Amino acid sequence: DLDNYKQIYSALAQYVAEMNRSIVTVTGVSSGVDWFNNVNESKNQSSGVIIAQNGKQLLILTDYSPVKQADDIIVTFNKGIQAHASLKEKDETTGLAVIAVELDVLNEDFLKNDITIATLGSSNIRDIAGLPVVALGRPMGINGSLGYGIITSSASESAASDTTYRILQTNIVGSQNAGGVLFNLQGQVIGIITNGKSATDMKNMVCAYGITDLKRHIEKMSNGEKFAYLGLKGVDVTEEANSELGVPYGAYITEVEMDSPAMLAGIQQGDV
């Protein structure tokens, strides 16, 4: 009945308030001078999620694009508290970055009572289709927006340089400029929202990189480590391709990026 319906959404609202303690707004501030020597300031925003605390810094996973050319990075926490941040490391393949806020600029009571470090769950679970999720950050293209829904598919992958990423598709109608994270109902991040990875006829449906495929990258960025780069895109050779076409098992190279180490080493499209 209607009372049960209200109770469900009341419980969801309470859950969202708890999860939002780990969600922040990231603002990249850039300055320039126009033709008349007037200083112009531009701001680009995204959402971020607090992923770790290393004893000196609070680490935040966010989109790389707003901070790429930024002269200053400002993080707005829950309750409107702001602090400056620095770029720890970026991953241009996924368009993600880790930024750091120094702990000594934040009040101890605030750190203890008002923010939460997000728990990274697993996206490689059986029967993930149908799993209820909450999208937080900016799923509607606006910071602070949210959406409720389910995972509808995890069958597609996004090929990137030297790796592939599992894509979680949802039934949440969002923005083509969506960002943020997907939480399951156990308080765990299971996906990082990305735009441009949905099927052509589902452009406004929120989708996300599965968190399991990103964990190694997140760890390296959190430690300020660079990524090894070959410049290859490929797919696994299927049993059908092996039996019907005689293609040996392995990684079938679908693309070699121009001037990449792989290209300079003589690796070509079609190699296995």
Regions from the language model: what does each represent?
Residues 11, 15, 185, 189-246:
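C-terminal cap/linker of serine protease catalytic domains
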Residues 23-27, 58-63, 126-139, 170-171, ...:
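Active-site-proximal beta-strands of protease catalytic cores
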